[in-house]
């Protein structure tokens, strides 16, 4: 099947979906209606571009016809030739765009994520920068219309985060944040630095897919669940009833502690959500390493300790080392305006995959 047959098949299916979504039987079946709506939405951009492309092809035919029928009218012929030139350039642009739109979609792109940020090398300054990254992602999520919920947080004495875990849910969350895993380096003068020297610190980000219980089932025998009293500042117990939960996955020794909520049940539910994501992610990594068919995507090495980005405060500069992108917009980016970075990463990934297909 060539690209034109593929595009026509997508358009035919899109029109069929439009009819199905108007069918009362489908409308009354919520699950099927949602599935078909999602499929229609995923094809919409491709169909719109294909229809515009067909119009460009018609414009080429019309311009060629106009040249033939210009009847010696130099001005009309010149205008038609310019229209033909413009239409042919548009045709090439649309063909590249449509090839990218037809690339196999990551089946996980519409999924929610669990985001982990940790202060790494650099002590208090690294923990403070972890907080800056948390704020950046929170504001980006807000701008996207996503829900951002901090599920677990371990703070240090200066207001930074040793570790913070958040659930990000909404449309196309994973598709836009999947490239954020790795080491984020910051270069700036710490608040505590009296000599004005620039220090380098690092925070790590890990993006994991939210995993539903029906998608990944953990054997209860593999879990140890401890219930204890939640503690507040200074270590004092703040609840008379034991509400804090610690869950350990015994085969991997992956551990989650949760005391953010007021009830044991809610803490347990949140802890299970995190541990399910971590365990699934752990085994997915092993499987991919064994197959050497990297889950890593084509961007970077996929190593979670790989330095992916540097934030240089003195020069107001952000550099993404994987794609050689440098922007003198650090303040803008840290305020949550990540679109320029995300779009560049998505485009680079698509271009690399297109090159692989063309080999």
Curated annotation (Swiss-Prot):
The keyword Plastid does not apply. This is Peptide chain release factor 1. SUPFAM superfamilies: Release factor. Peptide chain release factor 1 directs the termination of translation in response to the peptide chain termination codons UAG and UAA. Pfam families: PCRF (PF03462), RF-1 (PF00472). Transmembrane segments: none annotated. Its main location: cytoplasm. The keyword Kinase does not apply. One of its GO terms (cellular component) is cytoplasm. SMART domains: PCRF (SM00937). It comes from the Bacteria. Methylated by PrmC. Methylation increases the termination efficiency of RF1. GO terms for molecular function: translation release factor activity, codon specific. Keywords: Cytoplasm, Methylation, Protein biosynthesis. Gene3D superfamilies: 3.30.160.20, 3.30.70.1660, 6.10.140.1950. It is found in: Cytoplasm.
